[in-house]
UniProtKB/Swiss-Prot annotation:
UniProt main location, coarse: nucleus
InterPro entries: Clp1/Grc3, CLP1_P, P-loop_NTPase
UniProt name for this protein: Polynucleotide 5'-hydroxyl-kinase NOL9
Cross-link Glycyl lysine isopeptide (Lys-Gly) (interchain with G-Cter in SUMO2), where in sequence: K485
Length: 702
């Protein structure tokens, strides 16, 4: 009784507003009780206004309109355990509503078809309607079973071999687009029969039935398979590198499609995360492909230039893939030392590309036709040697296929003058110049501008005696051969193609260098992965592999990036990244070693390795390299540059207890070349940011 009296007493003390609010009728807009408009949020007021307008348009009471809206929303909800009521049959007097229901059901019918179907462990089937795309992240092997699709500019048709695609998190996501292909005039039944026969060798009966049920003319059927390579396993074995290929993120709702793609090793991404090409980029690609396929004036030489982070490398890959759709091979001249495409960093190389490039540089390293190890990620303070190496490598170009020239992103001050020298030296037929809103100012490199400007080592056309540009003075400065002086190269002009890109990248001048260093380390790790046994054998630690023993008197040594005292040469070589080169001089006449070179030679580089130890008693170098033994017999020079072994290789050595070899905290940064040796790249020009000043709304008057 005491409790009940206490409750009654508490009830009588309630406020008048609460009793009035509970007594008055509630307007049912939803399952929640009515609230004042003042307490509604912006989205709630907007939803209420939309319901009022909809009810006014339909001519019913707004409360009835709210009920209709709630019923329509309930109809769109997924089925639950409670069965939905069976709709009443449509009266015969209203035949006009039947076509509307039919069209509504037909427009929603494709949404009920799952876009991805699991067809086994690590396999998924993707059915793409014509001109539809599938953007994803991760790595997989793609086989086109029926139709025709395009990935990164490369066309994959039915019957062609599978392609390995690397849509990693260091670059933009890739997409699989279904193309419109030519078909003979056949009925849909005949097309289904043809597709069913093509799928027999890849899919079982149930999967073929699912494909035929969802089949439509001009569609493409793609098989996605799990991909695992020795390169991927080796890179992901180091801490912090696993997220590059597969990045797990929490999913609010796990669907069958997510599970099917997860077994493959990929993840569907939004279209905006994929690669988007501007109209000027597509126009430039179309023009260059047409010129390369016509071959009226010979094979074109295409030089691509522009500032940093504007999409030059992405354009080059897309152009290579486009050209490989029509041509058997494409030549590629790498002149960017810091971000090389097919080789470890610090190289100038010439390659013949016969297979598509469907990923970032560290996923498609190739063996070049000719390569010279410069030894630094930048040509600062040694431009003349850089020009000499470019000319030496370019001399191997046979002009049998189109040539794409990749240049550095340094386009200001001396970098622009160096680019003008490259244009005069290589005589390109087309110059593709990139520009964007966030890039540095760069003048249009028209033929007239190049003729009127002086380079670092070349003079303008107006300063030459002849009206046609000749490289005679340039040859004297670079010590060309006598036969080359007698027949100098003639400059005939080029066609300038401007490309505007809105390439948005989250790189700032502060973190650009760290990002570029990560990409260089990934290229070195990819090269070292060639030491691993083929799949499915397990990985072997680098310190467990047997190195080659090289006598002191068999090879010559040269430190390219800094002057080192002869007594400290072996300290610089030990535990370093070395270039395995071949020079013309014979070094076999020396009995003792080490043999030191006074100047850095311009010679062919056959590969790279790690000097993992030096035996002073037996006078042997211990070199760990994936270069074949038949090529190692011709190596007689070791070049050591500023390119360093990634820190993770030295720090994360499995099976080692105690002190890790070659790892120390006692490092003297004041030694010549010490900052370059640890991988720090000296920028071409110091980036000076202006301090942020707060706006002044008033000033004090004296």
């Amino acid at each position: 009784m005491a409790d009940s009296g206490l409750l009654l007493k508490r009830g009588s003390c309630r406020s008048t507003w609460l009793r009035v609010r509970k007594a008055r009728p509630q307007l049912i807009l939803s399952r929640r009780p009515r609230r004042r408009l003042g307490s509604l949020r912006w989205c709630g007021r907007r939803r209420l206004r939309w319901r009022l307008l909809q009810a006014q348009a339909s001519g019913v009471d707004w409360r009835e309109g709210a009920r209709q809206v709630s019923r329509a929303a309930a109809a769109r909800r997924p089925n639950t355990a409670t069965p939905s009521p069976i709709p009443s049959p449509t009266p015969a007097s209203e035949p006009e509503s039947e076509p509307e229901l039919e069209s509504a059901s037909s427009c929603h019918r494709p949404l009920l078809i799952p876009p991805v179907r699991p067809v086994g462990p690590g396999r998924a089937l993707l059915l793409l309607p014509v001109e539809q795309g599938f953007t994803f992240s991760g790595i997989c092997r793609v086989t086109c079973l029926y139709g025709q699709v395009q990935v990164f500019g490369f066309t994959i048709s039915q019957g062609q071999p599978a392609q390995d695609i690397f849509s990693v998190y260091t670059h933009s996501c890739l997409s699989i687009h279904a193309l419109h292909y030519s078909q003979p005039e056949k009925s849909k039944k005949e097309l289904k029969r043809e597709a069913r026969n093509l799928l027999k060798s890849h899919l079982n009966l149930d999967d073929r039935r699912w494909s035929m049920q969802n089949f439509s003319p001009q569609c493409s059927i793609v098989l996605l398979e799990h991909l695992k390579t020795a390169t991927v396993n080796f890179i992901t074995s180091y801490p912090g590198s696993s997220y590059i290929f597969v990045q797990e993120s929490p999913t609010p709702q796990i669907k069958p499609e997510y599970l099917a793609l997860r077994s493959v090793g990929i993840r569907r991404e939004k279209k905006r995360k994929g690669l988007q090409l501007t109209e000027s980029t597509l126009s430039a690609l179309e023009e260059l492909v047409n010129v390369s396929c016509e071959e009226v004036d010979g094979c074109p030489v295409i030089l691509v230039c522009g500032s940093q982070d504007v999409g030059k490398s992405t354009f080059n890959r897309y152009l290579i893939n486009h050209l490989l759709n029509s041509l058997p091979c494409v030549d590629y001249l790498e002149c960017d030392l810091g971000q090389t495409e097919f080789t470890p960093p610090g190289c100038i190389s010439l390659l013949n590309i016969t297979e598509p490039v469907l990923g970032p540089p560290f996923t498609h390293l190739r063996t070049p036709q000719k390569m010279v190890y410069y030894g630094k990620p930048s040509c600062k303070n040694n431009y003349e040697n850089y020009i000499d190496i470019v000319k030496y490598v370019f001399s191997a170009y046979k002009r049998e296929s189109p040539l794409i020239v990749n240049t550095m992103g340094w386009v200001s001050d001396q970098g622009l003058l160096l680019l003008i020298d490259l244009i005069r030296l290589l005589s390109p037929s087309h110059v593709v110049q990139f520009r964007s809103d966030h890039s540095k100012y760069m003048p249009d490199l028209t033929p007239q501008y190049v003729d009127d400007m002086d380079g670092l080592y070349t003079k303008s056309k107006t300063k030459m005696r002849n009206r046609r540009f000749r490289l005679a003075a340039f040859a004297d400065a670079l010590e060309f051969a006598d036969e080359e002086k007698e027949s100098p190269v003639e400059f005939t002009g080029h066609k300038l193609i401007g490309v505007y890109t809105d390439f948005a990248f989250r790189i700032t001048p502060r973190n650009r260098e760290s990002h570029n260093k990560i990409l260089r380390d990934l290229s070195i790790l990819s090269y070292l992965s060639q030491l691993q046994p083929p799949m499915p054998k397990p990985l072997s630690p680098l310190h467990s592999l047997t190195p080659y023993q090289v006598p002191f008197n068999a090879v010559a040594l040269r430190i390219t990036h800094s002057d080192v005292a002869p007594t400290h040469i072996l300290y610089a070589v030990n535990a370093s990244w070395v270039g395995l080169c071949k020079i013309q001089d014979d070094v076999r006449g020396y009995t003792n070693g080490p043999i030191l070179l006074a100047q850095t030679p311009i010679c062919d580089c056959l590969g790279f390795g790690i000097c993992r130890g030096i035996d002073m008693e037996k006078r042997l170098y211990h070199i760990l390299t994936p270069v074949p033994p038949e090529e190692l017999r011709t190596v007689n020079c070791l070049l050591v540059g500023a390119i360093a072994i990634p820190h993770c290789v030295l720090k994360c050595q499995r099976g080692i207890e105690g002190t890790v070899p070659y790892v120390t905290t006692d490092y003297n940064f004041k030694l010549p070349g010490a900052s370059e040796k640890i991988g720090a790249r000296e920028p071409e020009e110091a980036h000076k940011e202006k301090p942020y000043r707060r706006p002044k709304f008033c000033r004090k008057m004296k």
